[in-house]
């Protein structure tokens, strides 16, 4: 044994050929701080081996290395920048020593080689992969860029243009695509990966493969003329500005880093990468995106626990077809859970089946599934005008019209048709679950299951716990949502649950801003371009449906009259009374036409101003800051109240629900990450300026107390000193 560490070992696999195996105790290998230190120690041990002729790197897991340990990131970002820079130098010294070892080196890649794992294999001379391999540098998706030589070695290996595409998109490449780009040197079967790798190393040792010129190429400047470089980098920067925009600086920083180091050797280029990596770690964007990743892991861990605690759903039913019912049925069937789709009208069943067929056809056209698979999915959706076979279903999702009396009647009826262990779930957006449960004999088997439209695109499902809902029911519905490929978040019952409860104060802020003379087009522009929402409030209302919003607004006002009851007619009333329902009838705040792809195209409607004029008697200019504050304060206050009341369990789950359910700007990380970033005292000062506007602008006492105590919503990152490498 040459070296034995906790996460890797090194021994001779054949005379002269050392084999470094990543073998962490957990289910996957991560290039965490401890593993990186072990790599350094192992390489030191290898340098002392007099008989060493070649080095093979591999993993004993189904994945090579899934990346760095992201749980360590926020602690590392908190290190003083000079210390972080020094540590990066030490870490890169390890990979440089791997690259410089005076024998040929080869990485045998199975499964994921991502982030630091990819940077590790880039430091070797050759890379052989099996067909399961997936290789990439996803750091820009976390608001940073490669920091262990990825932005230096990859362009020198495959060229600047393809390297910039890999780095700026952050999307990993499958084995065949990585081979086409030159990221790897061959694809072999999993069974022969190690033996084929040893054979390839022997060829390099014997001089049949020129490993030294490969190494020289990776350490030299890029082979670009000044004209080629100017064209390449200018085109890349233009595309990045269009795709990533100003709110996500990492892709542009990565491109500029590659550009500025293009004519440098490896060591000088690594200095440029170091400087840019450290700068990105200090941005709120990086902390927010890393925070989203960690929050997502928390939500998934809760779902995994629910899956362990429950039996899998093998058969389901949906009551109410149409677009929503068809979308739910498609999602269930496409993930392997057959579904009965029941409705009282054949026309609705046809609409639901057409919706499922349309979604499958799109996947077929894009090559994402075969015709056989499409037929199998469609055949696992059974449309029906009666309850035949529903007694065998594990779960029934009710998705009829958003009317409490109709929903209660349908639920009571179907409860008599199902077996006593079956779960009933209501896909309602605002109606309290405990209210609907009053019509049921077994309320413990009932909960809410709020899907977002369009079902196939929106990742979030709110699982709503009623007063009498059992934990067993919650666990099984969470497990079913996970089976469907969704991200379930459990919330406690109240009107609107979590997402819609916090959305309607946002709409109230919009109505008040228009009442006070704001311009809806300017508001949309500010909330989209400056704050970062995918849609401004006027456009969002058009997409949701102004008739839908008008109805939900009344439900929310009844549930929270002290804050959400209106003091008179507002812009939503005015649009509703004018039959301006939004995209669904072609006219809302904007007018809509159908483009060549069959999608609604937004156009300015000059008549909108006249409708808005009926609920305001003034026009007044507002700054971007005033608009953002007046729009966001009502939502933020309601989010805080939901946490205080236990509607949502944690800041992490609240932020994920906002990002996945409403499209809250990921670069801000969610409401609680945003509050921590700007500071609670800063927020209180901002809110105080607008408290005269009404109850939705009154901040909860809990945030005042947190600010007074100097606290944040998220715990401070675990303090790390720069690790020795």
UniProtKB/Swiss-Prot annotation:
UniProt-listed PROSITE patterns: 3HCDH (PS00067), ENOYL_COA_HYDRATASE (PS00166)
Region (Enoyl-CoA hydratase/isomerase): 1-189
Residues given in the record as substrate binding sites: 296, 500, 660
Chain residues that bind NAD(+): 324, 343, 400-402, 407, 429, 453
Site feature: Important for catalytic activity: 119, 139
GO molecular function annotation: 3-hydroxybutyryl-CoA epimerase activity; delta(3)-delta(2)-enoyl-CoA isomerase activity; enoyl-CoA hydratase activity; long-chain-3-hydroxyacyl-CoA dehydrogenase activity; NAD+ binding
Region (3-hydroxyacyl-CoA dehydrogenase): 311-725
Superkingdom per UniProt: Bacteria
Catalytic residue list: 450
GO terms for biological process, alphabetical: fatty acid beta-oxidation
Family annotation (SUPFAM superfamilies): 6-phosphogluconate dehydrogenase C-terminal domain-like, ClpP/crotonase, NAD(P)-binding Rossmann-fold domains
Pathway(s) annotated for this protein in UniProt: Lipid metabolism; fatty acid beta-oxidation
InterPro entries the record matches: 3-OHacyl-CoA_DH_CS (IPR006180), 3-OHacyl-CoA_DH_NAD-bd (IPR006176), 3HC_DH_C (IPR006108), 6-PGluconate_DH-like_C_sf (IPR008927), ClpP/crotonase-like_dom_sf (IPR029045), Enoyl-CoA_hyd/isom_CS (IPR018376), Enoyl-CoA_hydra/iso (IPR001753), FA_oxidation_alpha_subunit (IPR050136)
EC number annotated for this UniProt entry: 4.2.1.17, 5.1.2.3, 5.3.3.8, 1.1.1.35
GO CC, alphabetical: fatty acid beta-oxidation multienzyme complex
Keyword Oxidoreductase: yes
Summary of subunit composition and partner proteins: Heterotetramer of two alpha chains (FadB) and two beta chains (FadA).
Biological role: Involved in the aerobic and anaerobic degradation of long-chain fatty acids via beta-oxidation cycle. Catalyzes the formation of 3-oxoacyl-CoA from enoyl-CoA via L-3-hydroxyacyl-CoA. It can also use D-3-hydroxyacyl-CoA and cis-3-enoyl-CoA as substrate.
Family designation: In the N-terminal section; belongs to the enoyl-CoA hydratase/isomerase family.
Protein name (Swiss-Prot/TrEMBL): Fatty acid oxidation complex subunit alpha
């Amino acid at each position: 044994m040459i070296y034995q560490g906790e996460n890797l070992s090194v021994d001779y696999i054949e005379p002269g050929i050392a084999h470094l195996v990543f073998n962490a105790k957990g289910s996957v290998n991560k290039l965490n701080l401890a593993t990186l230190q072990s790599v350094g120690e192992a390489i030191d041990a290898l340098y002392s081996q007099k008989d060493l002729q070649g080095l093979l790197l591999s993993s004993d897991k189904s994945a090579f290395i899934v990346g760095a340990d992201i749980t360590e990131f926020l602690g590392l970002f908190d290190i003083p920048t000079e210390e972080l820079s020094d540590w990066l130098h030490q870490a890169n010294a390890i990979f440089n020593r791997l690259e410089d070892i005076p024998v040929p080196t080869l990485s045998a890649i199975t499964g994921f080689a991502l982030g630091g794992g990819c940077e590790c294999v880039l430091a070797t001379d050759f890379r052989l992969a099996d067909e399961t391999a997936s290789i990439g540098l996803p750091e820009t998706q976390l608001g940073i860029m490669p920091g262990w030589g990825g932005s230096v070695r990859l362009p020198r290996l495959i060229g600047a243009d393809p390297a910039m595409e890999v780095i700026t998109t952050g999307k990993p490449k499958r084995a065949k695509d990585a081979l086409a780009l030159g990221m790897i040197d061959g694809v072999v079967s999993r069974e022969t990966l190690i033996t084929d790798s040893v054979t390839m190393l022997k060829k390099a040792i014997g001089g049949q493969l020129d490993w030294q010129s490969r190494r020289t190429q990776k350490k030299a400047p890029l082979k670009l003329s000044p004209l080629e470089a100017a064209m390449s980098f200018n085109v890349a920067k233009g595309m990045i500005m269009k795709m990533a925009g100003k709110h996500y600086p990492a892709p542009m920083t990565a491109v500029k880093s590659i550009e500025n180091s293009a004519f440098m050797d490896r060591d000088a280029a690594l200095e440029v990468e170091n400087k840019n990596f450290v700068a990105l770690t200090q941005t709120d964007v990086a902390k927010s995106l890393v925070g989203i990743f960690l929050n997502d892991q928390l939500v998934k861990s809760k779902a995994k626990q629910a899956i362990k605690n429950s039996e899998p759903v093998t058969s389901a039913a949906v009551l109410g077809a149409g677009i929503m019912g068809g979308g739910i049925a498609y999602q269930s069937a496409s993930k392997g859970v057959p579904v009965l789709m029941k409705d009282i009208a054949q026309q609705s069943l046809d609409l639901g089946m057409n919706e499922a067929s349309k979604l499958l056809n799109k996947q077929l056209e894009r090559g994402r599934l075969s015709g056989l698979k499409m037929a199998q999915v469609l055949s696992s959706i059974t449309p029906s005008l009666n309850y035949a076979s529903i007694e065998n279903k594990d779960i029934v999702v009710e998705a009829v019209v958003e009317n409490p009396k109709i929903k209660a009647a349908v639920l009571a009826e179907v409860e008599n048709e199902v077996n006593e262990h079956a779960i009933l779930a209501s896909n309602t957006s605002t109606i309290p679950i405990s209210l609907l449960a009053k019509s049921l004999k077994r309320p413990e088997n009932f909960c809410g299951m709020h899907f977002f439209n369009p079902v196939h695109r929106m990742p979030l499902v709110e699982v709503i716990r009623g007063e009498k809902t059992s934990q067993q029911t919650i666990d099984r519905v969470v497990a079913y949502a996970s089976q469907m490929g969704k991200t379930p978040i459990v919330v406690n019952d109240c009107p609107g649950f979590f997402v819609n409860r916090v959305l309607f104060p946002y709409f109230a802020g919009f109505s008040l801003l228009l009442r006070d003379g704001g311009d809806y087009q300017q508001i949309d522009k500010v909330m989209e371009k400056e704050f970062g929402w995918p849609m401004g409030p006027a456009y969002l209302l058009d997409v949701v449906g102004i008739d839908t919003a008008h109805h939900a607004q009344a439900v929310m006002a009844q549930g929270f009259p002290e804050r959400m009851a209106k003091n008179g007619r507002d812009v939503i009333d005015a649009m509703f009374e004018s039959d301006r329902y939004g995209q669904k009838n072609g006219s809302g705040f904007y007018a809509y036409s159908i483009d060549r792809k069959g999608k609604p195209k937004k156009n300015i409607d000059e008549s909108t101003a006249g409708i808005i004029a009926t609920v305001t008697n003034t026009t007044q200019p507002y700054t971007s800051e005033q608009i953002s504050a007046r729009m966001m304060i009502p939502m933020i206050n309601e989010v805080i109240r939901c946490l205080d009341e236990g509607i949502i369990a944690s800041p992490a789950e609240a932020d994920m629900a906002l990002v996945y359910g409403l499209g809250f700007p990921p670069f801000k990380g969610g409401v609680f990450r945003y509050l921590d970033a700007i500071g609670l005292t800063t927020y209180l000062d901002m809110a105080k300026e607008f408290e005269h506007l009404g109850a939705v602008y009154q901040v909860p006492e809990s945030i005042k107390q947190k600010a007074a105590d100097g606290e944040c919503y998220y715990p401070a990152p675990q303090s790390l000193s720069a690790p020795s490498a």
